Amino acid sequence: MSASPRLGFVQCISPAGLHRMAYHEWGDPANPRVLVCAHGLTRTGRDFDTVASALCGDYRVVCPDVAGRGRSEWLADANGYVVPQYVSDMVTLIARLNVEKVDWFGTSMGGLIGMGLAGLPKSPVRKLLLNDVGPKLAPSAVERIGAYLGLPVRFKTFEEGLAYLQTISASFGRHTPEQWRELNAAILKPVQGTDGLEWGLHYDPQLAVPFRKSTPEAIAAGEAALWRSFEAIEGPVLVVRGAQSDLLLRETVAEMVARGKHVSSVEVPDVGHAPTFVDPAQIAIAPQFFTGA
């Protein structure tokens, strides 16, 4: 069992060329039981440090930094920052891991990637945990996220950056100062400013390009495609919803349970979008679903 993750890289392809995707790996590298944990839109694979540490006795846990984030390379063409490209990258990652099946833990965008992959014929996804995300996303929450996505923010100190991240992550719920630091330390990176070293965000600001190009027609078509993928999923699905979530509405969860094949749900109290799975009660949800423990 690893006390800390191993960092690996895999070469992926897009229409604009090759790019390296980083992944953080926990547990026995020979373990055939693999859990892939995929993060949210502006986050990194290090979001899963706590839950990966808890599960790596049973699983080889692999937490990628999706293209344009964290230790991964930025795409040459910002129009590639879309779910189909991310699904393609994950197929490459799973091939690198040399396994036929994986379980999937996807938070927000990571859940959309998981749905896209799990809904394919002959999918490698065995079980799918969707953390506060579904085929239908509340427009007001998407607008809230879009308001800060890609802004050229800079901070004079690391602590100033942490304070900003805590503010925009308030919907994560209550955390101790130590937990906030652990969650957000990887989101900041040192950058050269006009007056010396400053701190910026880890991700490519061009992530906002396809996000801001979206039209009502494109959003409707995307939602319909996600429902088709979701309804095609053959394996068990657990939908985890933050009770105060503004992104995944309670009625959407009910619709997912009704329209999916093997779908169950659980609601996490006192949390919005999205549960961070650093609290023991939240962490316990994952092994109960994946292993029955």
From Swiss-Prot:
It is found in: Cytoplasm. Its EC number is 3.1.1.-. Disulfide bonds: none annotated. Transmembrane segments: none annotated. Pfam families: Abhydrolase_6 (PF12697). Disruption phenotype: Deletion of this gene enhances the deposition of PHB in the logarithmic phase in nutrient-rich medium. Belongs to the AB hydrolase superfamily. This is 3-hydroxybutyrate-oligomer hydrolase. It comes from Cupriavidus necator (strain ATCC 17699 / DSM 428 / KCTC 22496 / NCIMB 10442 / H16 / Stanier 337) (Ralstonia eutropha).
